[in-house]
Every structure is written in C-alpha cells, then in structure tokens.
Amino acid sequence: MKLATYKDGSRDGQLVVVARDLSVAHYATGIAHRLQQVLDDWNFLSPQLQDLYDALNRSRDSSGVASPARHAFPIDPRQCMAPLPRAYQWVNGSAYRNPQAPPDAGRQGSGPWLYQGASDDFWGPCDAVPCASEADGIDFEAEVAVITGDVRLGASPAQALDGVRLLLLANALCLRQLLPGELAQGLGPLQSRPITAFSPVAVTPDEVGTAWAQGRLALTLQSSWNGRKVGRCEAGAEVRFHFGHLIAHLCKTRRLRAGAIIGAGAVSDPDASHGYSCIADKRALETLQDGRSLTEFMKFGDTIRIEMKGRDGQSVFGAIEQEIVPLEPATAAL
C-alpha cells in the first residue's frame, strides 16, 4: 500500500491512503489520523489500511476515473508533508561504494558509517529550502530510506530487515563547506545538515515486488538539477551495507522504536555515465580525473527533482521537487 500525510494546519498532518497510480487519495480518518499511530500498532491497523487501499484501487475503472462511491480526491503533492512529519529518530549513513571517486571518511572502516540527524522537523516534498548563504556549499543528496517498526537490541541483519515497514525517498540537504569543520571536531554533522525532505508517498515493500530484495531496492533513482537530468543511478548497485546491516549496526547497543527512519546515503552508481545523486560525488570524480573540481554547488533559485520509477515505468513514491531560496527574516520566524 501507499501512504502519505496531508497538510491540515497541524504539525503531524492527516494520514491518507494513496492509489497505486498516485492519482487520488482517501483520508484514513476512520482507521488512524497519523502515520505514527499506525506504526505503533502495525499488526492491527495496517490490515485495515490495506483493505482501504485495495478498495481505492478497485474503485478505479478502465478509464482511470475514480468511482464517486469512494470519497477519493485528486492528490496534490504540494499539499503533502513528509509521510512522517516528525520522527523519534532519523539516522543517515553512507552505504554505497563509489569506485569512481576517492574514498572519504564516510566510506572507510569495517562497518557502516552513520550519523544522527534532526528528526523534529522534516520538510515536505515540494517545500522551498531556505539557506543563509550560497557560500555554504549547498548540495542535494538523493537517497532511499526506510521507516521501521520496533527492532530489538542485538538484532541480526536478517532480523533487522523484518522490522522494515515502509520505503521512501529522501533529499538530505548538506552544506558542504560547513561539514569539514564539524567532522574535525569529532562529534558529527550539525549545522551542515540543516534540512531533510521526503517523497510525498511512502510504500510498503511489496509495492515494488522483487525490486526489494535482501535489504536493497534495485530501481533507478533519477535526479534532475534545474530541469537537467544529472543522475540515473541504480539504487541496488554498489551497496556496501544494505538496510539490514545499517539497522543491525544501529541496534548493536540499543533498540529501535517504531517510527525510526534510516537513510542509506546518496545513491552511488559504479557506472559514471549514469551521473550522480549528490554534487560532492561529481566534484570528487572531477578532482580525480582533472585535478580540480569544476561543478559548483547549488545557487538560490536552483531546483532539484528526485524520483524513482518502477519496472512498469510508473512513479513509485511521487517526486521531491524543491527550490533553493535565500533565508528571509519571515522565513526564519517560527
């Protein structure tokens, strides 16, 4: 099934069930108001949502018109919040090996490299991204992420995968010029990781069929910067640590509670002709080939679109479409 959260003036929004073709949605009010409620009681509530999802898809006739018997409405991605607008935990990592670029601190070592990000204020898929300065090195990061249920302390990678409830896409914004100084302090990124946005829709793994296997999502992640396609990266390629590894690593000394979100980092493809999912990887490749980086980071007014299509050619999660805007006094207000 496919789930989204619609804006309703509150911080947590309203849970909606979305048709498979992403054309219409139906409020899940009679079952649950918030996605976190469903994650907390997954075994009881998710079958009810599945029934609504099946009915919503059945209500669409061969012409693609929704039956008036269903209280469905055309979905507008601009009205979507992040599927989980705020979460108990957001942990992002660097699961990919990029053979085209020199290894960095995030890709070295025997185990996964993870950092704890801000989870109290996720951004919607079409929300503009305010930044204080272009000099901070504004970079997008197109990623695949998962939302988990409870995962026990000491879970193995296989057991950890049993805790995956939903898949989604992320844009984990990074301010590259601030990152080295923070990493040098030894405490991980803070100011350099200001905003994370998510796809309008989160989906259960069965929605992608055999493309989800062994903790990897074997589909192409597409990134378009200012309308120009810069990345068609295979998300299942060059995965050094799959989601089972990432979650098990996190659970080595703690347990996870339902509603934790885990990201795998910018998708990196072994074939350089497939482009990139973050500007930093492109600049690293340029430095390796030419001795210096030529591609600049994002500027005010730039846009980024991140999307993944299934093997049927249809969008799986909907698209993240964001514009970089200068921070204004009104924007900075609560």
Where are these regions (language model features)?
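Short beta-strand-centered aromatic/proline hotspots
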Residues: 16
